[in-house]
């Protein structure tokens, strides 16, 4: 519900961050149930902020929301080189890859990762997001999905597992 309110601009980043912190605390309690199988894991989502960008608030927010949606999240951190994303694709077969950026100067890193993904594993889903990212950019570089907010990312992930 919070994600929907954020995407509809009913609440803003401070409220979203407070909600994400509360979710993070609840995930600490729920994590053992995911591990022992009492709560079904929907899949693995690998996320990182691309090379040249040290910003992580958006990435962390998306990670918490997606984890709260029942996905296992592998966070590669910030300033992540293309080869680390590609290694993660091999290490986590079937995972969905999430690329985050806040700086326009790092969009070229996103494009490089998507291009390399096509050469190695064209079926692997790559999502992109961040302040400078648009649907036009997503289409231009051939990424599979763009969302301006975490709510859209979770909805997309839930759709692809139904296919």
Stretch-by-stretch model annotation:
Residues 1-163:
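Domain-level signal for soluble alpha/beta catalytic cores
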